[in-house]
């Protein structure tokens, strides 16, 4: 899909205004569907949203970012809390929040205190020589 062309089409069809800057894919985005950069006017989009949620949801994400874009260049309130933004977003049926993506979670590590049995769940390994139980100061062990 040619992202720049698609964003231009959505802008003309849903806003009746031209998109004159650049739209690019950004695979590093994690919790957001897209970003608007007021400094140079370009838009970033997360390709994972298109892959996982489909074109209908992705179009609503594009509308959301175009609301920021058009309001900024019209010198109106373009931030999430501004009335102008909320009204335009509702008028074009854009998404307020991007849907949650499937996250490849790291396997949890479970540490257990040998003295009191307190259980700690962590994503990262800890140095068992350095750390002790926060409850009783007992020695921790990694559960398999």
Curated annotation (Swiss-Prot):
Domain SprT-like: from-to ranges: 4-143
Gene Ontology biological process terms from the UniProt entry: response to stress
Subcellular location: Cytoplasm
Keywords: Cytoplasm, Metal-binding, Zinc
InterPro entries: SprT-like_domain (IPR006640), SprT_Zn_ribbon (IPR035240), Uncharacterised_SprT-like (IPR023524)
Family named by the database record: Belongs to the SprT family.
Identification of the protein by name: Protein SprT-like
């Amino acid at each position: 899909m040619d992202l720049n062309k698609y964003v231009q089409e959505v802008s003309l069809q849903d806003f009746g205004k031209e998109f004159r800057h650049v739209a690019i894919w950004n695979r590093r985005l994690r919790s957001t569907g897209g970003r608007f950069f007021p400094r140079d006017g370009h838009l970033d989009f997360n390709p994972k949203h298109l892959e996982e949620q489909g074109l209908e949801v992705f179009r609503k994400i594009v509308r959301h970012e175009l609301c920021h874009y058009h309001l900024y260049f019209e010198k109106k309130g373009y931030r999430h809390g501004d009335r102008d933004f909320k009204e335009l977003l509702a008028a074009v049926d854009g998404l307020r929040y991007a849907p949650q993506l499937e996250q490849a979670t790291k396997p949890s590590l479970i540490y257990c205190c040998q003295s009191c049995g307190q259980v700690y769940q962590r994503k990262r390994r800890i140095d068992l020589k350095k750390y002790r139980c926060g409850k009783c100061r007992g020695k921790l062990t990694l559960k398999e």
